[in-house]
Each structure stands twice: as structure tokens, then as C-alpha cells.
Amino acid sequence: MDKLAYKNAVNKVFMAVLITAILGVLASIFSAFIATSAALDMTQAIVMGTSMPFTGLLSVLILPLLVVAANIYYVVCLGHLAKAVHENDVPAVKKLRTAMILSVISSIIGLCIFLVILSGSLTAIATMGAVIGIACAVLSIIAYIFTLIAYSKLKASETFPGKDGAKLLFIGAIIALCCGVLGAIPFLGVIGGIGVIAAMVLNIIGWLKIKNSEVEETAAAE
């Protein structure tokens, strides 16, 4: 592979991961503490014809939009990485890119709840909220499966320079998947939250190790 092209691509991916993680933390904080009340305040504002509260716009629309934008940048960076890695590793990176595309689609579908809130109908919010939630969950599960397969192939690859980092990414993805299950079980949400933090840290460290890995000059993938 072309060492310079690979390094540039990995640096961009790492930056995308970092930005996504920071925005994800901010979105989670707002989701945990004010998103529900903010959504209700927005609904009340729509019904009464008053201006929307800034906290509502921030938690329900602005932060999620920023997360989507960061994930789209992540997808673009993975596309560059797929062109820079050894041809043996191209399918795995493309599968990871597909997983991120599914995550972006899931996030965009999730943003549709904002349009439902604009209707001002509590019944519509409850019904469509459930439908949107199920659709997002299905897409997220498929994305996680693709992610696990991609990381599994990269950590076992003989041509991928950052195998040690890929191992951490694989572990982090498993933890994140388990946390998603735990988060749906009453009274286990706290454990799931701790696991999500651990998965995020492993994701950052994993890509950092890949970023700092030694690269040998070989033919780049077409």
C-alpha cells in the first residue's frame, strides 16, 4: 500500500472518530437529562403557538444533526481508507463503511421525530415514536453485525498494519452491542451506560493504535 495515502486516510478516520465521540457524549448528556422534558416543552410550544425553547431545539434537532454530519464525514474518510489499504483488506473496510452508512440512515430516521413533534399531536408522537424507534433499532443491529465482521477480519489480517488496534475495536464493538441489550432492561441502564463509555474509549484507543502503526510500502488497492 501507499504509506502516505494510508497515513493520511487513517489520520482523517481518527479525527472523524474523535469528533463523533465528543458529539455523541454531548448528545447522550442532553438525552439523559433534558431531552424528554425538552421534547414535551417543544410540543407545548407548538400547541400554544409560542416560540420553541432553545434546549428543545438543541437536544432534539441541533446536536443530532451535528452527530449525523460527523458520521457522514466518518463514512467519507472510510471511503478514502478503503482506497489506501492493501487489496486483501478492502472488503473489510468497505463493510465497516456500509455499517456506518446504516448508522447514518438510522440517525436520519431518528430525526424524523422532530417532524412528528411539529404536528403537535401527542398521539402521533407516541405512535410514530415507537415506529421510528423500532426502525432505528433494526438498522443499528445490522450495522453492529457488519461492524463486528469488519473488525474481526481486520484483526486477523496479515496485511493490515493496525491489527492490535483492530482487536480493541472488535472488543469495543462487542461491549457496545451488549450495552445496547442491557440498556433495554430495567434497572440495568447504569451498567449499560458505563459499558458505552468503555466502548467509546476502546474505539478511540483502537483507532489511535491504527493511526500510529508502522506501515510497509506495498501496492495500493485499486
Roles of regions detected by a PLM:
Residues 1-31, 35-51, 62-113, 135-179, ...:
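Membrane-interface extramembranous regions at the lipid-water interface
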Residues 40-46, 119-126:
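Membrane-interfacial hairpin junctions
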Residues 53-61, 127-135:
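Hydrophobic alpha-helical transmembrane segments
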Residues 116-117, 123, 127-133, 179-195:
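Short hydrophobic membrane-inserting alpha-helices and related fusion/pore-forming segments
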